[in-house]
Amino acid sequence: MPVARSAKFAFVALVSFVLAAPVALADKKTVCSITVNSADERETFKRYLPHDEYNFVELVERGRPDWLAASCRTGIKCDVLLISGHFDGGTEFYTDRLDAREYLPVDEMERVACSESCPGLFSQLKEVYLFGCNTLNADALHTASAEIVRSLVRAGYSANDAEALARMLGERHAESNRDHMRDIFKDVPVIYGFSGKAPLGKSAGPLLERYFQSGPSEIGSGRASTRLLGLFAPSSMTVAAGPDEADSRAGFRRDACHFSDDRLTPAQKVGFMHEFMRRDMAEVRLFLHHLEKYSASLGNDDRGTPAVSAALAEIAGDASARARFLEFARDADEPTVRARMFSFAGDMGWLTQAEVRGEVMQMFGERIAQGKVSAADVNLACKLNQDNRFAGELPRLHATPAQAARIPNAALLACLGSADGHARVLRALTGGNVDDVQIAQIYLHHRQLAGADEMRMVASGIARMNATDAQVRALNTLSRQPPSDRESLQELVRLFPLTRSVDVQRAIAGVLIRADHASLEKPELAVALRKTRLKSPDGGDMIDVLIRQLQTN
């Protein structure tokens, strides 16, 4: 009998162990990593977290472009997610390593989040660690300008209500990096990131070591760690939480997800665009980026399908939406916004391409008449006319001789094809007025100097300049279109020993480094530069690089 009881006890114990084993395994937390750049953070987590309590999974497969989709199919469920990569532009995590090509676009993260196409992988996330610059920067990427309030008043709101609603819409549509990350990681209780510059992996690793050595691990608890935030505080680490359905941005997230959700057809997405454009135009303006982006993504194949074609035709035929949209566009304060809205109106069939050009030229005419043409206007005009689509439109602008003589106006006219404007801008580049030189810089960023004659004119003009700041700017402009003719290069070589400014000498070196050295006596020039160069106040510089280049060649 005692033997039977002993055997029965052993059997029960064995069954209990077998049943308990999956529970024990299930209790292990899974730390997933997306290592786009530095592996220091991931390796520190692996080194300090006990492997009997944590599983570690790297989601990136080198050389496999569809690594995220492949990870979604594995059945892995992450409790913790580490993402390491540069993030300065706010559009993707990327690497500066030459031996790696992997990257993680924010668009892809939004698609996965909105489509719920990867429900297992991120369904039980408790913590996300975003090791990249500005990942949780709260600065607004979009702002509500004064026309928002004017539009709401036209729609029937009182002035006070319009201002209050504009503030609310501005906050809702600000779309900072922080907002993007919160929307992507919906319902995740703890999201760590950086409001500014983040430490590189080689610096972040030791800080994480100090965190793990300072006390018991809190990783995967779903609670923000004051110890971790304290250690990274000098590096701008901050924390946020993913929104739930009660969050003030939940409605915006639902709207934005319409364009990223793979479960919706293109026709359904175009239908949502039409629904959205029936709202207050103030909100349409603040959502313009998403509308433009989706419209641009519709290829000819999509547009040619009966369902999409019919949905677009409904938008084109909506006279009320067209009238309200164009009224808002013509009242917009920022020329860039006005141009974008006119272009979008063309995409929607509300304006012909000739009418789009006419609206833009009308806008530029108003800017000239009001004396408001700025560097931003010049940049916009040159960008819009990169493909010469405004050829033949210049006669629409009736600038007076006095107006055409102002350098910002001359540059705008030059961007649109004016030969007189082009000549005025070239003279302004070497005229000594810093503001005019800045305008010329912007213009020549988009347009090339026309041959050796213009090169020589600019080079000799620079040599005669007296104002140091303007001279440096002019030289920096020339360095983007370095001369190759001997006469232009000799003008700059003669200027080098005459100037009393090390900044001017450095700027000359910047031009000569990029120029064709074939017409120069390289050994003699290297000796002359070394003999006449001014002492550098802060170590090696562009002049040293040029001297080495001349000696090597």
Where are these regions (language model features)?
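A domain-level signal for caspase-like cysteine endopeptidase catalytic cores
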Residues: 25-92, 100, 104-105
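Non-catalytic all-alpha helical scaffold/repeat segments
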Residues: 253-553
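Bacterial N-terminal signal peptides
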Residues: 9-20
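Bacterial N-terminal signal peptides that target proteins for export
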Residues: 1-11
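A short, glycine/acidic-enriched catalytic loop
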Residues: 88-118, 134-136, 150-152
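Short, conserved loop/helix-junction motifs that constitute active-site signature segments
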Residues: 115-124, 184-185
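Extracytoplasmic/secreted cell-surface and envelope-processing proteins
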Residues: 41-43, 66-67, 89-95, 137-142, ...
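Active-site-proximal C-terminal subdomain of hydrolase catalytic domains
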Residues: 131-292
